[in-house]
C-alpha cells in the first residue's frame, strides 16, 4: 500500500471519508464525509472564514446552486468551461486526453491545444487502457451538469460550475450594502459541480465539490499601490513563474525561485500588489490548518492556460505522495470581465461612483425628453424610461445617440421592459460639466479555494507512521476531537469523574470523547490515529488530590494538573 491507500484505509475505518452510494457499487467522483471528516472539513472552512470575514472584512452571501442558462452564457462558461476528451473507437470508453497522455508519457500537457494533444497521442501510439483500442480525435467536452427549471424543460439551467457568479449577479446589492465604497469583498462557500470525463484520482477529482471563493472589488488604479501590501511585502515564498516553466534549460528545482513578495512585484514576477497580497493571505491560511510548508509552492498560469476571464493567476499547489503537485487554490485577477459581461447581457448598470482626487471638467450628454410624446407612447412606463436613461453610462449613451442619428431608433432594454425609442422622443446634446467623481467598473481579485482537495492534503500532510503507532498530527485549528477523556479503570468513581469532565469540556465548546474500553495505551493509540491533541486520564491520584494526567499527542509528554484547571489549560493551548 502506498501512502494514499493507507490514508484512505484509515479515513474509511475511522469515519473521515466514505465512498458515496457504496451499497449500490459507488460512482467515481463522489465521496461522503463521515462524522470526523465532516468536523475536519468544517474546521478548515471556519478557519478560512476567520481569515476572510474576520481578518479581511469580507461578508458572506449564499446563493442558489441551480443557475439559469443565460447567466452562464454571459459569463463565458457555456463556451469555455471544457476539457479535452478522447473516446475509444472500440469500447466507447471516454478519457481526458491530457490525463491519458501524462499517464503514458513523461510530459506536461498544461495549456496544450487540441491539435497538440492529438499529435502527442499519435506520436506515442497511446491506446485505450481498457481494451487497447484506438482513440477517436480529441474534442472538447462541456463540464457543466445541465438541468431545467420547472415542468416541461422550457427554462434551461446548469448546476453552477463555480460559486463566484452568484456574487457577480448580486453585485449591485452587495455594493449598496458596502455603501458603494470601494474596495470591498464578498465571499461564498458552497457546492459547485463539474461533470468530470473520467475522475480516477479519488478525492482529488470530484464531480461535486465544495468551493470557498472571495471576490475583492477594487478600482483598477489601486491595484499597483495596495495599502495592505505593506504588511506582507517581506514574506518569502516559493514561486514558479511562467517564464521559468517555459525555460527548458532549467531543472525542476531551478525553476522554483524563493523571493519576497516585494521583489516579486518589483521585478514583474507577480503582476501587482493586490494579487500578491492575497497570495500572502493564502499562505497564512494554509499554514494555520497544518499544511507542510515544504510541500507548498505558488505556480503562475501560462498565457495559453489562463482562464477566459483572467489577466493573471497564481495557483497554490500542494504536493501529494501519489499525485504529485495538485492545484488547491487559484488567486486570479479577473479584471472587470464578469461585471462587463453581465452588464452587456442584463442591461443593468454595474458601475460604482468613485470620487476623484481633484475636480475635473468633462463632456457629458444631457437629455431632454419630449414628455408629451413619450407619455402618450409609454403611458405609465414613461417614468421608468426617464430613470433608465439617467442611469446610462457614457458608452451606452454614445450607442443611443449614434443609433438615433443613423437608424432613427434605439431599443433600450431594462429589467422592467424594452423601450423602442424614436429620434423624435428626445434631444441629446453634449455639455461641459465639472465633476467630483466618475463611474467605473471595478476590477476583481479572486482567491478561489478547493476545500475538498485542501482537506485531503491536510490529512496527508498530517499522516505519520511511527514504530509503534499511526498519528494524524492535525493542527489544533482543525483537529476534529480536541480531547480524549479516560477513566484508568471502570470503578471507584473514576468513570463518573471522567464523564463529568467530558461534559464540562463540551459545555466550553470543545469536542471531547469519552473512552473506557481496553488498556490505556490502546486508548491513546485510538486518539492518536484520529489526531486528538490532548488526552486526560482520571486515576487513583485523582480521588485523593483532584489532579489528572494530561498527555500531549505529538511529544507524548505526560504531566499532572488540578482537574479544575483542565478546561482553561486546553483552551489556552488550542
Swiss-Prot record:
Its EC number is 6.1.1.14. SUPFAM superfamilies: Class II aaRS ABD-related, Class II aaRS and biotin synthetases. GO terms for cellular component: cytoplasm. ATP binds at residues 194-196, 204-209, 327-328, 450-453. GO terms for biological process: glycyl-tRNA aminoacylation. CDD domains: GlyRS-like_core, GlyRS_anticodon. Belongs to the class-II aminoacyl-tRNA synthetase family. This is Glycine--tRNA ligase. It comes from Methanococcus maripaludis (strain C7 / ATCC BAA-1331).
Amino acid at each position: 500500500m502506498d501512502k494514499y491507500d493507507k490514508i484512505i484505509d484509515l479515513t474509511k475505518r475511522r469515519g473521515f471519508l466514505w465512498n458515496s452510494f457504496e451499497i449500490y457499487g459507488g460512482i467515481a467522483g463522489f465521496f461522503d464525509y463521515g462524522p470526523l471528516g465532516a468536523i475536519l472539513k468544517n474546521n478548515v472552512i471556519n478557519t478560512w472564514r476567520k481569515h476572510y470575514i474576520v481578518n479581511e472584512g469580507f461578508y458572506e452571501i449564499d446563493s442558489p446552486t441551480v443557475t439559469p442558462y443565460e447567466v452562464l452564457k454571459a459569463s463565458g462558461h457555456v463556451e469555455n468551461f471544457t476539457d479535452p476528451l478522447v473516446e475509444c473507437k472500440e469500447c466507447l470508453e471516454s478519457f481526458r486526453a491530457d490525463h491519458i497522455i501524462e499517464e503514458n508519457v513523461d510530459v506536461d500537457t498544461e495549456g496544450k491545444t487540441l491539435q497538440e494533444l492529438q499529435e502527442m497521442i499519435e506520436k506515442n501510439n497511446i491506446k485505450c487502457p481498457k481494451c487497447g483500442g484506438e482513440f477517436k480525435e480529441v474534442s472538447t467536452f462541456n463540464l457543466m451538469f445541465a438541468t431545467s427549471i420547472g415542468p416541461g424543460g422550457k427554462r434551461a439551467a446548469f448546476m453552477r460550475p463555480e460559486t463566484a457568479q452568484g456574487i457577480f449577479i448580486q453585485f449591485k446589492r452587495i455594493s449598496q450594502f458596502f455603501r458603494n465604497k470601494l474596495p470591498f469583498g464578498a465571499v461564498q462557500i458552497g457546492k459547485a459541480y463539474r461533470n468530470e470525463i473520467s475522475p480516477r484520482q479519488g478525492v482529488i477529482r470530484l464531480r461535486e465539490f465544495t468551493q470557498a471563493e472571495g471576490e475583492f472589488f477594487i478600482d483598477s488604479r489601486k491595484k499597483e499601490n495596495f495599502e495592505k501590501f505593506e504588511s506582507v511585502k517581506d514574506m518569502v515564498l516559493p514561486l514558479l513563474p511562467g517564464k521559468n516553466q517555459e525555460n527548458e534549460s532549467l531543472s525542476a528545482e531551478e525553476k522554483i525561485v524563493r523571493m519576497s513578495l516585494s521583489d516579486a512585484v518589483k521585478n514583474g514576477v507577480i503582476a501587482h500588489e493586490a494579487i500578491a497580497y492575497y497570495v500572502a493571505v493564502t499562505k497564512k491560511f494554509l499554514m494555520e490548518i497544518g499544511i507542510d510548508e515544504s510541500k507548498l509552492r505558488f505556480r503562475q498560469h501560462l498565457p495559453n492556460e489562463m482562464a477566459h476571464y483572467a489577466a493573471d493567476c497564481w495557483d497554490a499547489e500542494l504536493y501529494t505522495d501519489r499525485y504529485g503537485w495538485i492545484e488547491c487554490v487559484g488567486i486570479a485577477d479577473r479584471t472587470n470581465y464578469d461585471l462587463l459581461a453581465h452588464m452587456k447581457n442584463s442591461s443593468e448598470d454595474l458601475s460604482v461612483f468613485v470620487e476623484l482626487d481633484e475636480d475635473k471638467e468633462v463632456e457629458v450628454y444631457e437629455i431632454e425628453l419630449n414628455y408629451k410624446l413619450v407619455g402618450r407612447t409609454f403611458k405609465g412606463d414613461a417614468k421608468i424610461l426617464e430613470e433608465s436613461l439617467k442611469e446610462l453610462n457614457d458608452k451606452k449613451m454614445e450607442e443611443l445617440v449614434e443609433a438615433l442619428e443613423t437608424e432613427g431608433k434605439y431599443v433600450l432594454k431594462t429589467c422592467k421592459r424594452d423601450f423602442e425609442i424614436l429620434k423624435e422622443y428626445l434631444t441629446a446634446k453634449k455639455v461641459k460639466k465639472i465633476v467630483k467623481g466618475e463611474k467605473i467598473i471595478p476590477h476583481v481579485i479572486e482567491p478561489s479555494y478547493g476545500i475538498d482537495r485542501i482537506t485531503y492534503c491536510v490529512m496527508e500532510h498530517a499522516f505519520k507512521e511511527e514504530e509503534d503507532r499511526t498519528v494524524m498530527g492535525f493542527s489544533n485549528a482543525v483537529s476534529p476531537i480536541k480531547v480524549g477523556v479516560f477513566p484508568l479503570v471502570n470503578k471507584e468513581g473514576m468513570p463518573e469523574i471522567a464523564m463529568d469532565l467530558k461534559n464540562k469540556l463540551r459545555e466550553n465548546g470543545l469536542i471531547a470523547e469519552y473512552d473506557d474500553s481496553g488498556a490505556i495505551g490502546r486508548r491513546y493509540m485510538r486518539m492518536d490515529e484520529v489526531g486528538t491533541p490532548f488526552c486526560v486520564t482520571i486515576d487513583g491520584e485523582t480521588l485523593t488530590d483532584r489532579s489528572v494526567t494530561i498527555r500531549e499527542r505529538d511529544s507524548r509528554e505526560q504531566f499532572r494538573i488540578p482537574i479544575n484547571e483542565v478546561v482553561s489549560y486546553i483552551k489556552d493551548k488550542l
